[in-house]
């Protein structure tokens, strides 16, 4: 979406907000508006617009994923996991990476390995990304033995990987 279109969406939102009204946006418009906030690193209205989007389109997976990311950002990992579990979509890279990040942050290496093994069994298309994304999280959490084990598992599967 063009910058002018995003500006119009934001202006429409702010005008309605100023008048005490609730504007209507389709799910794609909400997603575009949220994306523009992220790109500009301006989160002044992010929570409000996301809440409005989820109110208008509660079953929209993209908006639910943004809510999960917000939970993770706010370190509310249990809420993020509960929402991830409630989303009926499978084989979704964003959801799987968020789930694994939550397991790392909750110090649940057992669950992380269990879920990773499930992804391996399902021959997940983005399995290499799972290892590349998750290994640094384990290191950041100072779970050094677990990080080493996870990296070794990844190297066993992807011996040519230079990131691991």
Sequence positions of predicted segments:
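Start-of-helix register in tetratricopeptide repeats
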Residues: 24, 28, 62, 94, ...
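Structural register within alpha-helical repeat arrays
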Residues: 32-33, 66-67, 99, 133-134
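Residue at a conserved register position within TPR or TPR-like alpha-solenoid repeats
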Residues: 36-37, 71, 103, 138
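Canonical positions in the second alpha-helix
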Residues: 53, 86-87, 118-119, 153-154
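Short coil turns that delineate tetratricopeptide repeat
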Residues: 58, 90-92, 124-125, 159
């Amino acid at each position: 979406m063009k910058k002018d279109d995003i500006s119009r969406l934001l202006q429409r939102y702010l005008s309605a907000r100023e008048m005490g009204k609730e504007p209507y946006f389709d799910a794609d418009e909400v997603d575009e508006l949220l994306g523009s906030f992220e790109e500009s690193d301006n989160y002044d209205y992010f929570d409000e617009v996301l809440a409005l989007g989820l109110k208008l389109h509660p079953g929209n997976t993209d908006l639910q994923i943004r809510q999960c990311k917000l939970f993770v950002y706010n370190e509310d990992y249990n809420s993020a996991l509960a929402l991830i579990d409630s989303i009926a979509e499978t084989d979704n890279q964003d959801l799987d990476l968020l789930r694994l990040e939550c397991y790392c942050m909750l110090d649940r290496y057992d669950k992380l390995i269990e879920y990773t093994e499930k992804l391996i069994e399902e021959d997940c298309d983005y399995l290499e990304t799972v290892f590349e994304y998750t290994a640094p999280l384990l290191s950041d959490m100072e779970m050094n033995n677990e990080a080493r084990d996870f990296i070794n598992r990844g190297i066993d599967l992807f011996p040519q990987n230079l990131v691991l």
